[in-house]
Amino acid sequence: MNLLIMGLPGAGKGTQAAKIVEEFGVAHISTGDMFRAAMANQTEMGRLAKSYIDKGELVPDEVTNGIVKERLAEDDIAEKGFLLDGYPRTIEQAHALDATLEELGLRLDGVINIKVDPSCLIERLSGRIINRKTGETFHKVFNPPVDYKEEDYYQREDDKPETVKRRLDVNIAQGESILEHYRKLGLVTDIEGNQEITEVFADVEKALLELK
């Protein structure tokens, strides 16, 4: 089974990806892991990626696409199938993935989209606070500290509501075009992500069993 998992930051995509891998035994292909492995193994694309990263530059799409292609061509993919997590990030990468799969004789069986209302995600992502003295991380709503005093805690710039909203807006714009592409191919299953983790996975599992 060859799958793609999508979802906005904070939607719980990583948690569900781990559960899918555990339950269905597919190879988990996350962008970060792929880059680290390609650079550690000094593959052609790994060396290219490292040359950009060492200069503090963004890795161009053709290199990212090449690293994905290298990974999808490995033997375990034909045996186990895969779950792509964090790629494609743009519609251009989605088209490149289509071409790669066709070239390798693979096909995408389904796209799992973990849906959570952006306003809920802003609450999830912007609630993180850090204790100035201990460095411990808490959440204003979901994991509040005992005896909370505002002056004892600070919030990272990345976690402030306005920053979180800007980040989500970018992700929504990019994600919608990718989802539309896969919807036209009849591959997308939307999963309600604003429920307990076990309930989300029950819905994911049901959808995947129907694909088998």
UniProtKB/Swiss-Prot annotation:
GO terms for molecular function: adenylate kinase activity; ATP binding. Its EC number is 2.7.4.3. One of its GO terms (cellular component) is cytoplasm. InterPro entries: Adenyl_kin_sub, Adenylat/UMP-CMP_kin, Adenylat_kinase_CS, P-loop_NTPase. Its main location: cytoplasm. Monomer. Consists of three domains, a large central CORE domain and two small peripheral domains, NMPbind and LID, which undergo movements during catalysis. The LID domain closes over the site of phosphoryl transfer upon ATP binding. Assembling and dissambling the active center during each catalytic cycle provides an effective means to prevent ATP hydrolysis. Catalyzes the reversible transfer of the terminal phosphate group between ATP and AMP. Plays an important role in cellular energy homeostasis and in adenine nucleotide metabolism. This is Adenylate kinase. It comes from Streptococcus agalactiae serotype Ia (strain ATCC 27591 / A909 / CDC SS700). The lineage of its organism: Bacteria, Bacillati, Bacillota, Bacilli, Lactobacillales. The gene is adk.
